[in-house]
């Protein structure tokens, strides 16, 4: 069942039988009703009507991303603003390299080797369209807009998928990875990738490393 006016769904709300059609900004609230009448947790989906965000011109872009890392146990992104450690800067050719390769020994699983990493650069969008995004990173920003926010969540799965309208070409991207343990799940056990699909597609596919650029 679902509602389109922001109210909480009840067992007597509209039953989902066909794709939901909306014409403007809408808050969709969805729940599953069991045969017993018991309802699941409510999921909220914010639908925003957007024009295609324009691409940017970048002089002589090179494949890869710029990255900075800092040691420490961070549970919130804003804690990085007050971090008193030293940032280390480098470039990476693959988004998978945002994560430090380390052994899951006792010290690591106690959080002794935790750190934060921020990768920045550009993502190449192959054609105009509305794109759905999914990721287990702490945060993903595109065009300086927060499009994925998993802050504080257990990274074993993600329910914070988002969509954005993007024009063909390069768009600024920032990816935040916090190496920490939330709810007993080390974040480094999760995939360090971003998956996308156009609104006309059914399956998510991982963004290829060839789509990431730096200046």
Language-model segment annotations:
Residues 23-27, 128-130, 168-170:
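Extracellular Ig-like/FN3 beta-sandwich strand-entry sites
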């Amino acid at each position: 069942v679902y509602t389109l006016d922001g109210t909480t769904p009840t067992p007597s709300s509209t039953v989902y039988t066909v794709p939901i059609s909306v014409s403007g900004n809408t808050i969709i609230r969805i729940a599953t009703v069991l045969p017993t009448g018991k309802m699941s947790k409510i999921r909220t989906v914010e639908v925003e009507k957007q024009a295609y965000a324009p691409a940017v011109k970048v002089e002589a872009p090179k494949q890869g991303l710029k990255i900075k890392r800092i040691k420490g146990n961070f549970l919130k992104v804003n804690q990085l603003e007050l971090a008193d450690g030293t940032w280390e800067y480098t470039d990476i050719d693959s988004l998978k390299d945002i994560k430090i390769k380390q052994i899951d020994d006792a010290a690591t699983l106690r959080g002794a080797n935790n750190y934060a990493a921020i990768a920045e650069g550009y993502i190449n969008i192959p054609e105009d369209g509305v794109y759905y995004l999914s990721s287990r990173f702490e945060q993903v920003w595109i065009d300086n807009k927060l499009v994925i926010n998993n802050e504080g969540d257990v990274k074993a799965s993600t329910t914070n998928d988002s969509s954005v309208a993007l024009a063909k070409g390069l768009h600024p991207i920032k990816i935040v990875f916090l190496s920490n343990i939330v709810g007993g799940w080390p974040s480094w056990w999760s995939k360090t990738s971003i998956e996308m699909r156009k609104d006309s597609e059914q399956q998510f596919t991982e963004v290829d490393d060839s789509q990431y650029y730096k200046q």
